[in-house]
């Protein structure tokens, strides 16, 4: 069994649709550059990745209040992930939710799902371009 890195994050507000779940583990996936975000009880799993892996110029407009909610004090503490939709027949149809990114404070291990006010960001952004 290889060494798997997993980090537990507290989500005080839960995430959209799963507000009652407050703790998630983010762990490596064997399918890079993706990671798995799993509820502590193991019932809910999301595939996540950095949006910068497929969209270099991703500029989410995240409210300062959202960053304060997870107690970030500087840019080095901030991490942005997006949830991946794999429920497709063809890998070219895999999409990422750029509209509601997961924001993390990697120092204090606090997370939140925020809403990007950037009108160019969609709930279903195609990860693999033709």
Curated annotation (Swiss-Prot):
Alphabetic keyword roster: Bacterial flagellum biogenesis, Chaperone, Cytoplasm, Translation regulation
Protein species of origin: Borrelia turicatae (strain 91E135)
Subunit structure and binding partners: Interacts with translational regulator CsrA and flagellin(s).
Principal localisation: cytoplasm
Keyword Secreted listed: no
An example Gene Ontology biological process: bacterial-type flagellum assembly
Family in the record: Belongs to the FliW family.
Gene Ontology cellular component annotations, sorted alphabetically: cytoplasm
Location in or out of the cell: Cytoplasm
Protein name, UniProt field: Flagellar assembly factor FliW
Domain of life per record: Bacteria
Function: Acts as an anti-CsrA protein, binds CsrA and prevents it from repressing translation of its target genes, one of which is flagellin. Binds to flagellin and participates in the assembly of the flagellum.
Gene: fliW
């Amino acid at each position: 069994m290889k060494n798997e890195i997993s980090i537990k994050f507290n989500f005080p507000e839960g995430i959209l649709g799963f507000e009652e779940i407050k703790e998630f583990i983010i762990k490596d996936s064997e399918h890079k550059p993706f990671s798995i975000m799993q509820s502590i009880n193991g019932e809910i799993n999301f595939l996540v990745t950095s949006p910068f892996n497929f969209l270099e110029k991703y500029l989410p407009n995240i409210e300062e209040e959202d960053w304060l909610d997870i107690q970030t004090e500087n840019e080095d503490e901030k991490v942005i992930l997006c949830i991946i939709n794999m429920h497709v027949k063809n890998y070219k149809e895999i999409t990422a939710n750029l509209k509601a990114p997961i924001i993390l404070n990697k120092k204090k291990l606090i997370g939140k799902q925020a809403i990007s006010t950037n009108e160019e960001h969609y709930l279903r952004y195609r990860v693999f371009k033709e």
